[in-house]
Regions:
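Non-globular, low-confidence helical/coil segments that flank catalytic cores
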Residues: 2-342
Length: 342
């Protein structure tokens, strides 16, 4: 009976997905504790220094709640949602959200975005259908104007039957949104059309294949480029998916690496880390989480490569700014032990 119920549930979800699909282009026909008082923000957040050749600014930047630069060129926010992932990219009038943590983190992400004055998300990227990545997305989808929603096109046999995934599909359907397949090699420009030299864009690096037997390896991996700086976001991609990226010939080098799978030893292989060659690594994990993330093996590999490590469990939310030449890090807990030179 249990097997029959599971099969029926899978058929229900698959039927719902196919019912809202555009088969020609694979688009589904559907359509932090950060919620702290501003005084706490002002007290808790401090600026890190420029990496490489950056210099101090002559005048203090315009800020929101005393730590978020309102007039920043490009900002990447690694939002503290506990044991989950949520990253926000803000560039001029464009905003991109990658995941939104567990279901109970949805309101956290919504209020964080609202504190920045965001009304529209030009892109929402659901890296893969695990609850600690897409659980909070329905709240986000229901709270903002949404442009393009990108997710992996998962095979029928791997289609999840969870309530979390059903809530995600329902939220999309309720807003009349369409889900666009993440295809390796696709690029999306967010450049300022008035600046001829602006190269700001993100490229989908993975999933490379369509036959993974672990949802983590279906994760959307993307590379964001702004001027001479770059960022990679890996979802929960594990070493199998990392190897496929390397074999694809894609340029995986980046200044900042969002470490895969919350710092699990199943991700961030030595070969992948060498190819990315980041100056900074950000690990999105919860305090004293039951998985033991990040694993010691991952930290050792990052340390031995002289990579500066930021962690949500130690540093709270991490924001990295780029002016196209240099990057600057801001953390919620500037006195955290992980905020010293590695």
């Amino acid at each position: 009976m249990a097997a029959k119920r599971k099969t029926a549930a899978k058929r229900t979800v698959q039927k719902a997905a196919k019912k809202i699909a555009d088969p020609s282009r694979w688009k589904f026909g559907i359509t932090f504790p950060i919620v702290l008082i501003l005084i706490l923000f002002a007290a808790a957040f401090v600026y890190g220094g420029y990496l490489e050749s950056g210099t101090e600014e002559d005048e203090p930047p315009q800020v929101v709640s005393n730590f978020i630069k309102k007039d920043a060129d490009l900002a990447v926010h690694y939002i503290d949602v506990g044991q989950g992932d949520s990253s926000l990219i803000v560039y001029k009038d464009k905003s991109i959200l990658i995941d939104a943590g567990e279901r109970d983190s949805g309101s956290t992400v919504v209020e964080y975005l609202q504190s920045l004055g965001i009304e529209k998300l030009d892109y929402v990227i659901a890296t893969h259908p695990h609850s600690d990545h897409i659980g909070g997305l329905p709240d986000v989808i229901n709270s903002f104007e949404i442009g393009t929603v990108i997710a992996p096109r998962i095979s029928d046999e791997m289609t999840p039957t969870t309530k979390t995934y059903e809530r995600f599909l329902t939220a999309l359907s309720g807003k009349g949104l369409r889900l666009t397949a993440a295809n390796a090699g696709d690029t999306y420009s967010i450049a300022d059309p008035d600046i001829e030299s602006d190269n700001t864009e993100f490229e989908i690096l993975a999933p490379v294949k369509n036959d993974y037997d672990d949802l983590n390896n279906w994760s959307v991996v993307l590379k964001l480029v702004h001027g001479g700086t770059s960022f990679i976001f890996t979802g929960d991609a594990e070493q199998s998916a990392e190897n496929d990226i390397l074999d694809s010939g894609a340029d995986g080098s980046a200044d900042v690496l969002k470490v895969g799978h919350h710092g699990s030893s199943t991700s961030t292989s030595k070969a992948f880390l060498k190819a990315v060659s980041p100056s900074i690594a950000v690990i999105q994990c919860g305090t004293d989480n039951s998985y033991g993330h990040p694993h010691a093996e991952t930290i050792e590999k990052l340390d031995s490569s002289n990579v500066k490590i930021y962690r949500n469990d130690y540093d709270g939310t991490v924001i990295i700014y780029s002016d196209g030449k240099d990057i600057r890090a801001v953390t919620e807990k500037g006195d955290a032990k992980q905020n010293v030179d590695n």
